[in-house]
Amino acid sequence: MKNLNKNTKIIVGLSGGVDSSVTALLLLKQGYQVEALFMKNWEEDDKGRYCSAKQDLSDAQNITNKLSIKLHTINFSVDYWNDVFTHFLKEYKKGRTPNPDILCNQKIKFGAFLKHAISLGADKIATGHYARIAKKNGTYQLKTGLDNNKDQSYFLHLLSQYQLSKSLFPLGETNKIDVRNIATENGFVTAKKKDSTGICFIGERKFSEFLATYLPKQQGNIVGEQGQFIKHHQGLAFYTIGQRKGLEIGGGFGKSGKPWFVADKCIERNELVVVQGDHTLLYYQTLNTSKPYWINTPPTLPMTCNAKIRYRQQSQSCMISQDNNKQLKIIFKQPQRAITPGQSIVFYDNETCLGGAIIEYR
């Protein structure tokens, strides 16, 4: 941002939360021409019990009124359904566990949103993500946010050079505590607003309850590591690798009182394999991927780097190689717990996010 002209028009993705509120304030204080754009990505149910779009819009209006900046609104519900949600459902039907937030960033927040912002005259867009962008040798790099607990580069690893060139992350060099303090000092209604968790279209519902409205139940067996029948499940889509909560396996099974976890899904037999405690079947040292994406020039393989198989995981050392189909094979230095097909593995070189791929199998 240091090299930007003060006449630069920046449109902030204002969600009605504290992070985007402070983002708008910081840019305004730096003298830029700031406007805001609130986007709606999901049509609520008639009772409005789950989605908070109305309240979020009200909070966004409150912030823009306080800052005396213009607020635009746009409905991307159709785009979200076509580009994100349909893929989400297809993956769950296959028994996989997708991450819609990553696709939403690529297709909606830095896709449809960016395009619309430019049509409104924006030179750049800004969001409240905790990440950083650097330019080196004529190309843009995605860097981790300085607040390790809030770093969101994992969700942004599919951004293109063009998307990075048009984006700003003012919160990348700050931390959440300071952001809330700034919001409080400026009397923002969002100062103490709870951070959004989970997926926007699910809201406060149980995930299985939401999924059941779109996917038919398909009863199968829950079995132990030796194939012994334990109970029935209502569909593999309602479970994910490593899951503990919701299995509801009583005390009449197993040799100990240790909790049960999902270790595997057998799609062909429609079986859910469960184990007790910190079982070895929960750990794998290798995985294979599809759809590799590199933010900058693809590296020479094989190579050693760090990787994360889920958000907020501590980076893990690994070796990346390429198979005959040009897909990536990952070997970790240490076995990893609950490697989950459909999720993303994201690669790092210290604080630089290199890119990522989709986990296919272990």
Swiss-Prot record:
Species of origin: Vesicomyosocius okutanii subsp. Calyptogena okutanii (strain HA)
Record GO biological process: tRNA wobble position uridine thiolation
EC identifiers of the protein: 2.8.1.13
Cysteines engaged in disulfide bonds, as pairs: 104-200
Cross-referenced Pfam families: tRNA_Me_trans, tRNA_Me_trans_C, tRNA_Me_trans_M
Cellular component terms (Gene Ontology): cytoplasm
Name of the protein in its database record: tRNA-specific 2-thiouridylase MnmA
Site (Interaction with tRNA): residue numbering on this chain: 129, 343
Domain of life from the UniProt record: Bacteria
Function: Catalyzes the 2-thiolation of uridine at the wobble position (U34) of tRNA, leading to the formation of s(2)U34.
